[in-house]
Structures are given as structure tokens and as C-alpha cells.
Amino acid sequence: IAADAQQVGQIGGSLAAEILREVLHHQDRARLIVATGASQFATLERLTSEPGIDWARVDAFHLDEYIGLSADHPASFCGYLRDRFVSKVPVGSFHYLDGTRDPAEVVAQATEAFGKGPIDLALIGIGENGHLAFNDPPADFKTSATYHVVQLDEACRMQQVGEGWFGSLDEVPTHALSMTVKAIMASHNIVCSVPDERKAEAVRNTLQKEITPDVPASILREHPHITLVLDSASAKLL
């Protein structure tokens, strides 16, 4: 448990860097899932400034994206990842989810790229409603798909307004492309950064309620190699 959001990012980012360096020491390439949202600002800032990572040997994957948003929209995750990650490090490859293209086509392409090997590290957060990526409650824990099209619930859409990505609920897309819970859980390592008082109830439910699709992030308790990084605000109900 860190003091504040900035420290959450310092811890999460340096741990992610340590894992990537270790993986690259033992194998030719590393495969990384990168998350977005306000919770990841400091984590990505720290990770991209860490020394000793041969980024040319890292293949990175996009976790989720709104359907219908172009990369130049301020709330686009493509734009976020381009500005906060891809433009900062010479990553070997980055597999974007393009929200403007035919969703079925995007899902098929992303699934093929993802399926070429195991994922070494996933950087993720937890939503105010307990979602993982855009898998809102009740989440599908059973699907064997890697990516799918999901409908966003109102709590998830309101969170995006609250974080300042959109001016009103009407502006927030109703559907998105998302990596599935099963695909996230298949990662060898997970670093989950969750700062902010807004997430306190979701954190408590994740750690203390039964493991249930109604609290999608509760499934993380079944992962053997996960580090959950909180700040005093997000941990205040524990």
C-alpha cells in the first residue's frame, strides 16, 4: 500500500520493469499487455523511464478500446497508448485495437496476434464497478475467446465522465472491444495498479467478497503471480 497515486505508479512501474528485464534475460522476446485510464498514468511514466529494457524485443498488446472512436479523440485508448507508451519507447511491435474498423475483423486480427505465444506480463487496473478491462459485471469468466465486443454498463460509462475523458454520459460509447477475463488471467505475471478513493469499494469487494462474475476483479485472487498496488485512499475500506 503506497502513500498516493504517484507512488503507486513508481512501485507498479518499477516492478513491471524488473519483470520485463528478467524475462528478456531468459528468452528472446517478451509479450506485454498495456492498460489505460487515469490509474495507469504514473505506472507507464515510470516504466517508460526505466533503464535496461531492450524494448525492440518487446511485443505489446492493447487491452480494450471504445467502438466508434478514432485515435485522435481525446478519450481514445489508441491515442493514450501512442502518447504515453509507444512514442516514449522503441517497442518491437504494438497491436492496437482500432475502434473505427469492423469490430469482428479487429477481434479476429487481435486474436491471431495474441495467440502466437504466452503473455509474460499484464499491466491492468480495476474499475469503479469492479470491471477488468471492459468486462463489466456480470463478467463472462468462461468464454474461450481472447477478445470480444461488450456493452458498457452505466457505472462504467459514468466513470469515464468522472475521470474527464468525456463531457457527458451521452458522449460515451455504449460498446467496446475488450480482452476477455480468461485471456488476462492467462498472463504469467500481473501488476494491478489501483490508486484513488473512487476505487475503494471495488478494492474491498475484489479482496473480501466471494469470487463472482458480479465482481469481475475478484477472479484475480486465483492468479498465482499477481501484485496489487494500492494507495491509502483506495485501501481505506480494508
Residue spans for each PLM region:
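Ligand-binding beta-strand-loop-alpha-helix segment within the catalytic cores
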Residues: 54-123
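Glycine-rich beta-strand-to-loop/alpha-helix junction loops that act as flexible
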Residues: 34-39, 124-128, 195
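Glycine-rich phosphate-binding loop
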Residues: 117-142
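Class I SAM-dependent methyltransferase SAM-binding "motif I" and its flanking Rossmann-like core
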Residues: 133-179
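ATP/nucleoside-binding phosphotransfer catalytic cores, i.e., glycine-rich phosphate-binding loops
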Residues: 179-182, 186-238
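Glycine-rich N-terminal segment of FAD-binding domains in flavoprotein oxidoreductases
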Residues: 21-51
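A glycine- and small-aliphatic-rich helix-loop capping segment at beta-alpha/alpha-beta transitions
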Residues: 45-55, 137-146, 209-211
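N-terminal glycine-/serine-/threonine-rich phosphate-binding loop
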Residues: 1-32, 104
